[in-house]
Amino acid sequence: MNKLPILIFMLLVCSMFISSDCQKHTDIKCSSSSSCYEPCRGVTGRAHGKCMNGRCTCYY
């Protein structure tokens, strides 16, 4: 039996869990993604973030 489809499925599921843990939703209001850089540096230690629906989402 070919185990390649099972391996690909498991890799996909694991990568989905890892990517969902890499973002932090905040209550910091924003108008553009550039206004999230400094607040995200305080939350995650990195200046990676974007403005989504008027709130900053920070990434690790």
Curated annotation (Swiss-Prot):
GO terms for molecular function: ion channel inhibitor activity; potassium channel regulator activity; toxin activity. The record marks 59 as: Aromatic residue of the functional dyad. It comes from Lychas mucronatus (Chinese swimming scorpion). The record marks 50 as: Basic residue of the functional dyad. Belongs to the short scorpion toxin superfamily. Potassium channel inhibitor family. Alpha-KTx 12 subfamily. Expressed by the venom gland. Residues 1-22 form the signal peptide. Has the structural arrangement of an alpha-helix connected to antiparallel beta-sheets by disulfide bonds (CS-alpha/beta). The keyword Disulfide bond applies. It is found in: Secreted. This is Potassium channel toxin alpha-KTx 12.5. This recombinant toxin inhibits the mammalian voltage-gated potassium channels Kv1.3/KCNA3 (IC(50)=28 nM). Kv1.1/KCNA1 and Kv1.2/KCNA2 potassium channels are also weakly inhibited (IC(50)=1.73 uM and IC(50)=12.63 uM, respectively). Disulfide bonds join 30-51, 36-56, 40-58. Keywords: Disulfide bond, Ion channel impairing toxin, Neurotoxin, Potassium channel impairing toxin, Secreted, Signal, Toxin, Voltage-gated potassium channel impairing toxin.
